């Protein structure tokens, strides 16, 4: 039992972070305090008024502290520890992904495109948008309003005639000399920039002036073009929910909680417009106060900077935060400008908060229905396999085209469904083309022939395939020389039916040494189909990406003496890679910058492929 009295006697009154461990040495809770001794002493009072705290204290085996220079530093360190250790008594934000942005590049003829990840590309970033669909929708709209190129530079630099986008009026064709002047193109770029900044009226004023000037100069064709552009923009503005009140960029957070599941709804407002919303379902320990949940979510959401997330000027929440000031100080420091957290709002801000609350409640209802269905499916699978619990399942699939660009996928489900942060893909190499057995063996070795923490050992491993695939998997596990319990997982082959129809699968269960055909309406089968299909799509996605990379590589990169400029010249003068491959030696020699010796090397290399 933990000796609290002896431990507290040596704890400092300085600010810092504490980590609580259970008897297995696992971190079960991370907290911060401006006075470590005072805060830690509060856990060991005789009259604890929180069930959550009582449960936590009963599992404490040891405590470690880290002294910090300030409360602000303690707050940041706390969230770093939560991210690193994922303690079960802390609120945890699951599977957060980086947000997509719209990027306007900094080039002679800027292109407009979507971007996710670190902001290494020079240009202006607009967003964040809640999901990729919102970015695609906005890009499609921009293409209709402003004829700016969206093509990759590799395409733009090698055009010899305008593409289809030019033909249908969605690009002004800056890739071809004479179609649009630099000034005219830049003007459309400026309009798009203003539009993305929410300055729609400025765009309209400029366009109206342009239309009037063109009309006065009797250039009626250009005047009609500007008129159509004005009408299109007005039609878009009428559909958008725009506040008349001048609003800074802000995020609005609302929480709905029921039956142990919490939904945090984040509503993104930029220049008074709703960019979109996104629902989060963090892991919440039982009996967690909603103010604590809000506080922890704000810290994790904005202070874990790997997502490339921009901190807005204003964050509106629907619960009072005990550490509002400390969070504001830290967020201001991170953002490099003043950040306000507001919990008592009026006017349009109140309307936006109400909108977020309605969305949170609606998303929670949907999630509860889904969670109940998942639990029913897990229960059915447990009964089928005579298991008391299933905490983790993994499923493998192989994807290739005629044995080329082989990819293996591993997807992971926990008790809440897909655990996408643990998904993995494996490049398969050094095997006979099309040998799925060898591919599966290589994937399993890459996954399991290494140390595993107890919670990472799956209860079930599904192999998408019949007896042959399953037998190869069993051979791999028999040969594993690892410290973890390799006999724990049940290996199950999922063989497709005669007509490869869903619902006709045969399950080959290794430990029970039997084959099972479940009814099409079986909840256990539905769960197996879900994880199998998820693995299949994950494998296909990786394979397609790898195949596309192989397809788009020109084949010129590996030829000595062919750098970027010569490669560009070859593609431009000979009409793309197919033209280069079909060109005669004389045609290759005629390309500027290509000597006779280099032309011969290119010709021979491409012929030998």
UniProtKB/Swiss-Prot annotation:
Spell out the Pfam families in the cross-references. Answer: GIY-YIG, HHH_5, UVR, UvrC_RNaseH, UvrC_RNaseH_dom
Highest taxon of the source? Bacteria
* Intracellular or extracellular location(s): Cytoplasm
Entry's Gene Ontology cellular component terms: cytoplasm; excinuclease repair complex
One GO MF term attached to the UniProt entry? excinuclease ABC activity
Would I find Acetylation among this entry's keywords? no
Q: Can you list the disulfide-bonded cysteine pairs?
A: none
**Keyword annotations of the record:** Cytoplasm, DNA damage, DNA excision, DNA repair, Excision nuclease, SOS response
Domain annotation GIY-YIG: ranges: 13-91
The UVR domain, residue ranges: 201-236
* The keyword DNA repair appears for this protein: yes
Biological process, per Gene Ontology: nucleotide-excision repair; SOS response
Major localization class: cytoplasm
Protein family according to the UniProt entry: Belongs to the UvrC family.
Question: What does the UniProt function comment say about this protein?
Answer: The UvrABC repair system catalyzes the recognition and processing of DNA lesions. UvrC both incises the 5' and 3' sides of the lesion. The N-terminal half is responsible for the 3' incision and the C-terminal half is responsible for the 5' incision.
Q: How does it assemble?
A: Interacts with UvrB in an incision complex.
Q: What's the protein here called?
A: UvrABC system protein C
Q: Tell me which species this is from.
A: Histophilus somni (strain 129Pt)
Tell me the classification of the organism that encodes this protein: Bacteria, Pseudomonadati, Pseudomonadota, Gammaproteobacteria, Pasteurellales
Gene that produces this protein:
uvrC
